[in-house]
Amino acid sequence: YKGMLHRPNVLGEDDMLEGLIRVRQMHIRVIEETGLTSADEILYPDYYRYFSDLLSYAAVGARSTENQQHRFISSGLDIPVGMKNPTGGSFEVMLNSIAATQKQHMFMYRGYEVESEGNPFSHGILRGAVDVTGATVPNYHYEDLCRLYEMYAQKNLTNMAVVVDVNHSNSGKRWYEQDR
């Protein structure tokens, strides 16, 4: 199952148009019922425009953080964007992604040449790692955060913020481990 965007009815067929409509309705319902705007992962950069008026936070996933188009799009957003460390765990790759999104860029988007101003609110998200044996390796410990702080300082980035994602490899994908 690829998610609601691809298949809005779990038992039905793929229907991305209906998926876009349903995801948008879901975000609107959250706003109406809670008064809070949503956060979402930018899985497909070209689709962000369908939700941009409803989101107050975006994340770029571990498998997309090195993707140039994700970096370009993130550099032009007016909301905070969290760049996850890749599945291998590299802080350096994550910080390079943050540095790229904090800079101005000129790029093609939906057939147009656009220029971004850079996103000063871009920051890191620690989601743990998977080692060569397939074992999960958490990266939220004090020593990890100290190492990340030192690496952040060396890069001289605008926003030295980090979010710890307690899911994924930081909990071994076991929900009951998330609260420790």
Regions found by a protein language model. Name each.
Residues 1-147, 151, 168-178:
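Active-site-facing alpha/beta catalytic cores
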Residues 155-157:
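Short helix-capping segments at alpha-helix termini
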Residues 164:
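Conserved, mostly hydrophobic/aromatic
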